[in-house]
């Protein structure tokens, strides 16, 4: 089976995978579930094994949510800086899981953390990607008021990724929340303008506009489905594809 997979040519040479911090919680209410980390590391390792270059951005919502404390009175900039640190913690945990699976990985941070991570450098990141290392981009964009979704799209554009893959707990984009509305229908494909016009909430406005303005395809899929990530990279139609209109 593994030989058959490696014989197939990947559809994408370089991807940017966006994971939510909540995805790392697994069945826990807070923090990081080591079993989830190990499973994700193996799935990423499958991609590296067939020659795909992988950039990673992980949210921090499993450890800290600046927006929630901001609503309770905390200074928004302070809260966002704390959220950036949470993403660094998740990135370090993911690097450890990858390296324990013998997958070389590098953590880069948008805020300087000498001795803990490398500082973000686009050219250096691309060199490491080309050498087969997984590069994990942490601390968002380094600026408050920007989400990790926006950071993922920005880094994807900077490293010239072929696609942004957004891992969620549902298998694509729906007309409504499928957990609340049993009649919600899934979209197979959408354009950026349709996402904006329908206010589907796939990502924040900044992230969607970045992808649209730079013709960066975006696919939303369920990371909890075994093999979904590999299937996408090999050309499978998992989840929902969002790209610019052909008109």
Swiss-Prot record:
Q: Where is this protein localized, as stated in its record?
A: Cytoplasm
| Top-level enzyme category | transferase
Give the highest taxon in the source lineage. Answer: Bacteria
From the UniProt record, give the pathway where this protein acts.
Answer: Pyrimidine metabolism; CTP biosynthesis via de novo pathway; UDP from UMP (UMPK route): step 1/1
* Catalytic reaction annotation: UMP + ATP = UDP + ADP
Binding positions for ATP per the UniProt entry: 18-21, 61, 65, 168, 174, 177
Report any Pfam family annotated for this entry.
Answer: AA_kinase
- What biological-process GO terms show up in the record? 'de novo' CTP biosynthetic process; UDP biosynthetic process
Among InterPro entries, the record links this protein to:
AceGlu_kinase-like_sf (IPR036393), Asp/Glu/Uridylate_kinase (IPR001048), Uridylate_kinase (IPR011817), Uridylate_kinase_bac (IPR015963)
Q: What is its EC number?
A: 2.7.4.22
Q: How does it assemble?
A: Homohexamer.
Record PANTHER family: URIDYLATE KINASE, URIDYLATE KINASE PUMPKIN, CHLOROPLASTIC
For this entry, the protein name equals Uridylate kinase
Species source reads Stutzerimonas stutzeri (strain A1501)
């Amino acid at each position: 089976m593994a030989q058959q997979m490696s014989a197939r040519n990947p559809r994408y040479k370089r991807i940017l995978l966006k994971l939510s911090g909540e995805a790392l919680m697994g069945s826990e209410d807070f923090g990081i579930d080591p079993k989830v980390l190990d499973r994700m590391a193996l799935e990423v390792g499958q991609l590296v094994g067939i020659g795909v270059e992988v950039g990673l951005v992980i949210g921090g919502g499993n450890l800290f949510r600046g927006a929630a404390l901001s609503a309770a009175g905390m200074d928004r900039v302070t809260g966002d800086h704390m959220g950036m640190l949470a993403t660094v913690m998740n990135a370090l945990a993911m690097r450890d899981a990858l390296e324990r699976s013998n997958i070389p990985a590098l953590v880069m941070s948008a805020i300087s953390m000498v001795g803990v991570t490398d500082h973000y450098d686009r050219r250096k990141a691309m060199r490491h990607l080309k050498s087969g290392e997984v590069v994990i981009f942490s601390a968002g964009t380094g600026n408050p008021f920007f989400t990790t979704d926006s950071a993922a799209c920005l880094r994807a554009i900077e490293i010239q990724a072929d696609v942004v893959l957004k891992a969620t707990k549902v298998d694509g984009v729906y007309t409504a929340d499928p957990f609340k509305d049993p009649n919600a229908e899934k979209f197979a494909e959408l354009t950026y303008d349709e996402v904006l016009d329908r206010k589907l909430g796939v990502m924040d406005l900044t992230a969607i506009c970045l992808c649209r303005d730079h013709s960066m395809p975006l696919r939303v899929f369920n990371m909890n489905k075994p093999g979904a990530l590999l299937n996408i990279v090999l050309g499978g139609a998992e989840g929902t594809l969002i790209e610019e209109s052909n008109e």
